[in-house]
From Swiss-Prot:
Role description: Required for insertion of 4Fe-4S clusters.
Gene name of this polypeptide: erpA
Protein name: Putative iron-sulfur cluster insertion protein ErpA
Binding site for iron-sulfur cluster: C51, C115, C117
Source organism per UniProt: Burkholderia ambifaria (strain MC40-6)
Keyword terms of this UniProt record: Iron, Iron-sulfur, Metal-binding
Pfam families: Fe-S_biosyn
Domain of life: Bacteria
GO BP of this protein: iron-sulfur cluster assembly
Keyword Heme: no
GO molecular function terms listed in the Swiss-Prot or TrEMBL record: 2 iron, 2 sulfur cluster binding; 4 iron, 4 sulfur cluster binding; iron ion binding
Subunit structure: Homodimer.
InterPro entries: FeS_biogenesis, FeS_cluster_insertion, FeS_cluster_insertion_CS, FeS_cluster_insertion_RrpA, HesB-like_dom_sf
Cofactor(s) of this protein: iron-sulfur cluster
Length: 123
C-alpha cells in the first residue's frame, strides 16, 4: 500500500505579493475610461533616483512584458516588472483623495527610510 503525505508547504496558500486596493483600481479604471483605450494597463515600477535612492513610478502601458507580474482587480490590470517586484513585495498600492490632495500612495514594508514627498525610499 502506498501512502501520500502532503507537506505544509503544498497545502498553505501563497502570500499575496502586494495589495492593489479597490480605491486604486477604481481610479485607474476611471482614468482608462477617460483615455478611451480599454487596452491600457497600469504599470508600477521602481527606479533609481529621488532623495532616498529609489523612487516609484506609474505609467499606462498597452503591452504585458514576459517578465511582468500581472494582478487583475475590478477590471484593471496592474503590471510590475521583475526588477521592481522585489522592492514591492508586501506593499499596498492605494489611492487617496483628501485635504492633502489626490494621489496614488504606496505603503511599502521593505522601505527602511522614505523622504517627505513620499515617492522616494531606500531599502
Amino acid at each position: 500500500m502506498n501512502a501520500v503525505t502532503e507537506s505544509a508547504a503544498t497545502t498553505a496558500e501563497m502570500p499575496v505579493p502586494f495589495v492593489f486596493t479597490d480605491a486604486a483600481a477604481d481610479k485607474v479604471k476611471q482614468l482608462i475610461d477617460e483615455e478611451g483605450n480599454p487596452d491600457l494597463k497600469l504599470r508600477v515600477f521602481v527606479q533609481g533616483g529621488g532623495c532616498s535612492g529609489f523612487q516609484y513610478g506609474f505609467t499606462f502601458d498597452e503591452e504585458v512584458n514576459e517578465d511582468d507580474t500581472v494582478m487583475n482587480k475590478n477590471g484593471v490590470q496592474l503590471l510590475i516588472d521583475s526588477m521592481s517586484y522585489q522592492y514591492l513585495v508586501g506593499a499596498e498600492i492605494d489611492y487617496k483623495d483628501d485635504l492633502n490632495g489626490a494621489q496614488f500612495v504606496i505603503k511599502n514594508p521593505n522601505a527602511t527610510t522614505t523622504c517627505g514627498c513620499g515617492s522616494s525610499f531606500s531599502v
